[in-house]
């Protein structure tokens, strides 16, 4: 499935949340879902609900691809432990998302650009693959020149240290952060801009693999 390239505000309106963390909340101007002029939303079938939860998760992590969902599920489904937690961890610990959570970028899309353009270092080495899986103990920092980028400095200045997830540490002065421990399911859920039923998504994917 191709990457979504349409208006991001349309996605936010569809789910009724400022899902991408933008300064201007698109719901203030148009609170209704696209194509609707009232607040009534149609009741969905079980299959429709599964699709919606899947689309919500994709949006929460910067419009990730269908094949990335399937790949993540295949990697965890036969492992011991909480499948839903391990599945969600695959996306929460993506490099672009960690960069976003640390406050190096105001939005997940800006974080994706920082990674793709080679501004981000992992344990001192450049990594430009946004889907790179960050493991506990890995340090995330920026190149010296990149520390002076306006999008970085402005974002860090506005970063509330108290909003930093417990599984991350941040040294603002050094432009450096670390994934301290693997995040728990409830910790990840608290960081998402809207509730996502991960179990429903895993059930849907179980019929696709």
Curated annotation (Swiss-Prot):
InterPro entries: Ribosomal_uS4, Ribosomal_uS4_bac-type, Ribosomal_uS4_N, S4_RNA-bd, S4_RNA-bd_sf. It holds the Pfam family Ribosomal_S4. Coiled coil: none annotated. Keywords: Ribonucleoprotein, Ribosomal protein, RNA-binding, rRNA-binding. One of its GO terms (cellular component) is small ribosomal subunit. Residues 22-45 are annotated as: Disordered. Gene3D superfamilies: Ribosomal Protein S4 Delta 41, Chain A, domain 1, RNA-binding S4 domain. GO terms for molecular function: rRNA binding; structural constituent of ribosome. NCBIfam families: PRK05327.1, rpsD_bact. One of the primary rRNA binding proteins, it binds directly to 16S rRNA where it nucleates assembly of the body of the 30S subunit. This is Small ribosomal subunit protein uS4. It comes from Chlamydia trachomatis serovar D (strain ATCC VR-885 / DSM 19411 / UW-3/Cx). The lineage of its organism: Bacteria, Pseudomonadati, Chlamydiota, Chlamydiia, Chlamydiales.
